[in-house]
Each structure stands twice: as C-alpha cells, then as structure tokens.
Amino acid sequence: MKCEIEEFIAYLHNTKGTSKNTEVSYERDLRKMEQFLGNEGVDRVQNVTATNLNSFEMYLEREKFAASTISRSIASMRAFFQYCCQQGLLLENPADILKAPKIEKKMPGILTVEEVDLLLNQPKENTAKGVRDKAMLELLYATGIRVSELIGLKLENINLKL
C-alpha cells in the first residue's frame, strides 16, 4: 500500500495541483490508516474492505481525535481509494460508506480595540523587517485575508499606482 500512497500524493501534486499543506495532511492521514490496517493484517489495497475502514474510523474516535481530523481522514481515504479505482486497482471504493462526523463550528474570537492597537504597534518601524511586519498586520486587519493568502501574495498582486 506504501507505493500506492506515494503515487497518489504525486498524482495530487502533478495532476490536481493541490497545495503542499493538503498533500502533507493527506499523506499523514493515509500513513496512519496504512499503519492501522497493517496491524490488522491488511497490507494490500486490494484487501481493504469497508469494514476495515469503519474500524479505523472507530479507532480514531476512541483515540479522541477531533471531529475535523476524522472528517479530513475520511476525505483523504475517499480520494485515495477513488484514485485506486481509477487506476484499475479496485472495482469499487470501500470508503464510500464512511460518514464524516458533524463538525461543530466555533466562532472566531474577536480582539478588543485595545488588543488590536497593541498588536499593530508591536513591530518596530525603524527597521525594514518592522515596516514589513507592520504592513502585513495592517493588511490582515484591514482586509480579513487569511495568513496563507497573505503569504501567497506576489508583487504583481499589488497595485502600486494608488
């Protein structure tokens, strides 16, 4: 199963153009599944059953993994076994029967005006790094973009003619 997982991660990267974070998460999830199944005596993709995957899901629940982690693991397994079906390794996807747990959505915490002021005044503006950090914090605060979006910005994304 190790080779199939490696090929799947390469497929995600080369064909689907997934982010590095997605690839790392999927690989971690699938390696955890592979280890669990190996302990159960299942070491080939062709031998994996829906019952095996259901047992793995119950194991994750017993180990007190968060609902969001279990949900992502199920998504990883579904995608992996769908890939195996497309490659002709399986006739049907054993992960299709898995149901993701309900994820409780928590509202993000809100900073007070004082906390925002304190945060925005942290960078020392007498250095280039401080000016950069201040600009990044101001952009995050003013627009609400995610940190991953901020990090992904390129110079050509910025309108310098304002």
Q: Where are the language model's segments positioned?
A:
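Conserved catalytic core of the tyrosine transesterase superfamily
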Residues: M1-L162
